[in-house]
Amino acid sequence: MPKAAGDAKLLIQSLNKAYAATPTNLKIIDLYVVFAVVTALLQVVYMGIVGSFPFNSFLSGVLSCIGTAVLAVCHRIQVNKDNKEFKDLAPERAFADFVLCSLVLHLVIMNFLG
């Protein structure tokens, strides 16, 4: 086996080992982020195959997915116990921030639809 392949295998093993120690609530947020990004990619593939006639709808869908993923990543950063920057922030406050920002994002998206 080439050295680069061995290094890649060691890297993947160390990442899997580190991720196994991640708390369940952070893994759920990660799953939500992956779902939002995959949904955005599916919309882009659909637009490439079928077309983008109602372009506002396409943009709204993709921006909603990407915006939601970004907000979820920010929420993950805030609720991570290992992050010293947000140690004084209560998890309930972080979730309230996430919900409020999501509401504003989706109101803007709905306004963009017309």
Swiss-Prot record:
Residues 1-30, 74-93 are cytoplasmic. InterPro entries: DAD/Ost2 (IPR003038). One of its GO terms (cellular component) is oligosaccharyltransferase complex. Residues 52 are lumenal. Signal peptide: none annotated. Belongs to the DAD/OST2 family. This is Dolichyl-diphosphooligosaccharide--protein glycosyltransferase subunit DAD1.
